[in-house]
Amino acid sequence: MAERDSEPRVNIIRPDDEPEVEEERVPDPDMVIKHPLQNSWAMWFFKNDKSRDWKDNLRVITTFDTVEDFWGLYNHTLPASKLQSGCDYSVFKAGIQPMWEDAQNKKGGRWLINLNKTQRQTHLDDFWLETLLCLIGEGFDEHSEEICGATVNIRNKGDKLGLWTRDAQKTEATKKIGIKLKESLSVPPKIVIGFQAHSDTAGKAGSTVKNRFTV
């Protein structure tokens, strides 16, 4: 019969045998490498207050010019679907205001996607994000220079998403931008989206404005 050990075995580790614990290093924010965008952008917020002038209801939230700053902004702002009725988000190239009267916009127009109330919960946020990614990623290829910005309008009667372009007279470029937008958002082929020139829209109710182009 084997003789049992009279004392329990102890695993002795000398101090110099202890495993090293690597401290987690927090990167210096100034040393983080950011990925620049081709253009600088500004995000705007509009809240309809009828007691104030329209322009006074529009303000810049912030500007950004890197991929990381865009995601930091997007992840810390309220989703479009959660905005109150009468509110807008706009993202435009730096130096361009989200209004028809701006010199960069007045000759242009917008591709317009209308969404009903049920689509606010199912499609609006995805459509808005995909539009922004096309915007800041220069996703319209050689026609990206024609892009001014994008807006999302939250309304009781139905929401609107608009992609604003610089020159409504550039028919070929405008149509290709619309086709690319529709593809990027995976809009079903049977659903038609239209382009309206700002000169046709100014001073008219939305339902009376005719589309210049459709895709």
Swiss-Prot record:
Gene Ontology MF terms: RNA 7-methylguanosine cap binding; translation initiation factor activity
Cross-referenced Pfam families: IF4E
Phosphoprotein recorded as keyword: yes
Entries under InterPro entries matching the protein: TIF_eIF4e-like (IPR023398), TIF_eIF_4E (IPR001040), TIF_eIF_4E_CS (IPR019770)
GO CC annotation: eukaryotic translation initiation factor 4F complex
UniProt-annotated stretches for the region Disordered: 1-27
Post-translational modification: Phosphorylation increases the ability of the protein to bind to mRNA caps and to form the eIF4F complex.
A GO biological-process term: regulation of translation
Transmembrane segments: none
Modified residues (Phosphoserine): S207
Cystine bridges: none
Keyword entries, A-Z: Initiation factor, Phosphoprotein, Protein biosynthesis, RNA-binding, Translation regulation
PANTHER family to which the protein is assigned, alphabetical: EUKARYOTIC TRANSLATION INITIATION FACTOR 4E RELATED (PTHR11960), EUKARYOTIC TRANSLATION INITIATION FACTOR 4E1-RELATED (PTHR11960:SF8)
Protein function: Recognizes and binds the 7-methylguanosine-containing mRNA cap during an early step in the initiation of protein synthesis and facilitates ribosome binding by inducing the unwinding of the mRNAs secondary structures.
Family, similarity comment: Belongs to the eukaryotic initiation factor 4E family.
Subunit and interaction comment: eIF4F is a multi-subunit complex, the composition of which varies with external and internal environmental conditions. It is composed of at least eIF4A, eIF4E and eIF4G. eIF4E is also known to interact with other partners.
Name the UniProt record assigns to this protein: Eukaryotic translation initiation factor 4E
Organism from which the protein derives: Aplysia californica (California sea hare)
Lineage: Eukaryota, Metazoa, Spiralia, Lophotrochozoa, Mollusca
